[in-house]
Amino acid sequence: MAPSHVDKVNTRTWSASIVFMVLTFVNVSVHLVLSNFPHLGYPCVYYHVVDFERLNMSAYNVMHLHTPMLFLDSVQLVCYAVFMQLVFLAVTIYYLVCWIKISMRKDKGMSLNQSTRDISYMGDSLTAFLFILSMDTFQLFTLTMSFRLPSMIAFMAAVHFFCLTIFNVSMVTQYRSYKRSLFFFSRLHPKLKGTVQFRTLIVNLVEVALGFNTTVVAMALCYGFGNNFFVRTGHMVLAVFVVYAIISIIYFLLIEAVFFQYVKVQFGYHLGAFFGLCGLIYPIVQYDTFLSNEYRTGISWSFGMLFFIWAMFTTCRAVRYFRGRGSGSVKYQALATASGEEVAALSHHDSLESRRLREEEDDDDEDFEDA
């Protein structure tokens, strides 16, 4: 079937979105490379935000001065930036693969607006725009770190986390209910069936980034709050654990209540949350200023509670996943054939209909003989 006018318009719009996506990825990559050289317009390197040697857990914030708070150190920030670039690269490659398979195929399909359906399921123009926003906000986040502006660092970390969250939700749900998403999957072009597995990998990879960004946004919010209000540094360190726990629990519950219906294999956020916990441990273990004071007990208990929450939700996800795989074949077998009661009811209805037709034929014969 020839592509319709709607297919042509949507394909062109989607293609333009992918072109802008590639340009944005190149822009962010160049920015990250150049930001390692302070003399090229950046006041400082982005990965050196806090001097942990000057951190004092018992001190209060001094207005108009930079107060060191709990944040990622230089090695962690470089690894974080490199990993985020790899995630952006993987998502960009995914969109390019989908574009090639949808735009360059010779068999356009037998359904009306087939390309529009395929684009809508694999990642439409709005989802591509959300991904562009995620890359742009990440670029602005690293830019604010190079200027060492606590308030802007906290703001851009929250905006980037929000954009990445919306992009992940759109990739998982396609803005539809589960039944409608299943209907669109059944109408997908046969040549895109294998790409769905690639899409599942991308969803989990984005969720890994989202899980680690939970730690980053918790640190950034408390870092900005601690540099703008008269609070003690030790209290802000403990507040990082509270913010992290609240955000991670909300996401764990959303995965178990809603998102698991759309994508069965969802362990990306759990893996990213684990890496985030390790990211919290590293600066605290590395620098003695965190543990050589009265906050040692509170920090230890906070770590224990966070790991317990993570282990509980990860175990729940694993149990539900493997239990769903074990019962999947029974569900499909039940849908394959009709039940015995339905077959018996249909047979009884057919026999009654046949008897009624025979009686009418006999009556007609009798009337004809009388005539």
Swiss-Prot record:
Virion surface side, ranges: 35-79, 148-151, 222-239, 286-298
Basic and acidic residues composition-biased segments: 347-359
Superkingdom as given in the UniProt entry: Viruses
Membrane topology of the entry: Multi-pass membrane protein
UniProt keyword Ribonucleoprotein present: no
Keywords per UniProt: Disulfide bond, Glycoprotein, Host endosome, Host Golgi apparatus, Host membrane, Host nucleus, Membrane, Transmembrane, Transmembrane helix, Viral envelope protein, Virion
InterPro entries assigned: Herpes_glycop_M
Annotated region described as Disordered, given as residue ranges: 346-371
Acidic residues composition bias: residue spans: 360-371
GO CC terms, sorted: host cell endosome membrane; host cell Golgi apparatus; host cell nuclear inner membrane; plasma membrane; viral envelope; virion membrane
Stated name of the protein: Envelope glycoprotein M
Gene name per UniProt: gM
